[in-house]
Amino acid sequence: MYFIFHFICSQCVAFYRSLFVANILHQHKFSFPIISVGNISLGGTGKTPFIYYLARICNKLKIKHVVVSRGYKKLSSGTCVVHDGKQTLCYDPLITGDEPLMLALKLKTTPIIVDNKKNRALHYVKQAFPQHIVLLDDSFQSHYIRKTFEIVLFNCLVQKKDLRFFPFGKLREPLSSLSRAHFVVFTKHNLSIKENKAVHSALSVVKKNNIPYLYSNISSSISQHSINKVQPIKWKQTPLKKLPKNNILLLCCGIGDPQSFIQTSQQYEPNICQSLLFSDHYNYAQNEQSFMQKIKLLYIKHGFSGLLTTDKDFIKIKNLSLKSIQWFAEIKLQFFIVDIKIHLIEEDKLIRHIKSLGP
């Protein structure tokens, strides 16, 4: 039965793509370079840390750049300027989406534009930032946009059983679609014990089509956040090398690949009483009543003193209502945030391509 489903999906993907090749459907072309960062599987490949990495490379090379994202699961419509290159203009993740806001707070000088219609966002960039190159998030499937350079990320933790179309597996497209990429990065390489069959299959397609590729590793840092003042809300942030001893922690996250977060956080030897895992881009504000009820019940059960989570989750948790923040302050709850960064092995191979797109 799955064979039939796979055949139908593959044919649909190929047919849709062929409409653009035959100019039946038209691609929008822009005068500035567009670097696409995407994947062929659902969630957890590390697109946001990779966008952050590319933005930092552009800064080092003094290449003007802007990040464009659809702001997945944001509640706003139209074009939203999260960061104008000088300051963050919106701090509400419900309006911006969690990942664009996280990038705006980290990058500080990179314009961040979100719009559920990427084409509209690119037209805005054309007017507002005409001399910039675009880092276009999650756009490998955006066939209606002509992209200059296609980077595809492939998670080394993906298993062979995941190489099926959703909902039977994690694929958005067949592995053969990797042939459209200009560059492939195999992410989270240091978390995989060995190259599994899924990576081997993807690598076969990449090598067959002579596509340049690299491996990337991830590293992390951890910081402690506490509430200094409730009205107005003020937070104190303290970088840490390790977790305080004897702290009982509740692990909480809503990301695409929670297992890699759990695996990465083990280096800090956390004393985890329980894990609270939600779907990717979990909306804490919309589910605040349910979330707080779970937190309070687990607090009664375990008496934890801290919450171990990701920066992507934390920007949404600290945006909860004043009532929830007050409760966190009353029990003196500490938040321990694990921040993920990527490191490319032999990164010069990719940097050469980025340089060629600059001025």
Feature-to-residue mapping (PLM):
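Walker A (P-loop) phosphate-binding motif
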Residues: 17-87
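Phosphate/Mg2+-binding loops and adjacent switch elements
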Residues: 72-207
